Amino acid sequence: MTAATASFRHRSRLAPLLEAWSGLTAFLDVGVGAVLDLAIRFWLAKIFFVSGMLKIVNWDVTIFLYANEHPVPGIDAATAALIGTGIELLCPIFLVFGIGTRFAAIPMFLTAAFLQFSYKELTDHALWMVLLTFLILRGPGALSLDYFIAKHLERSAIPFSRSLY
């Protein structure tokens, strides 16, 4: 038996294992990965939405905090509070449904970064920034409206339409 024949037989024995591994990783990416993406989106949406609701309920306190605790340079406290609250109430809705997820995650990331670097350095904010970066770079996953819409845009004339989800 030559070395080439032995090598071929060795590779042919590995082929089923490699195919099984490829199938497993594809399943994990589409199946488990999609559920994990959905869980991340829901978890972040809950955190930001609850924060926005608390700001509305205590609007005077919210304006006080934006004026004294974490002022935004160049913007008065009421305007900054309105922008911040708007981000915390609107963007999570987009995350939950998985529509425009990348675009919705950007202002949420900027909000978390602002709080991390100007107010208090908390591990929670850092974790949120990591997960939001994940959503910005990877997209919302297969369990999202973005994914289902993009499947119908494969032959669209819209540039980069396939990469939107």
Where are these regions (language model features)?
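Extended, low-polarity transmembrane helix blocks
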Residues: 1-60, 74-86, 90, 97-165
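Short Gly/aromatic-enriched secondary-structure transition segments
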Residues: 61-69
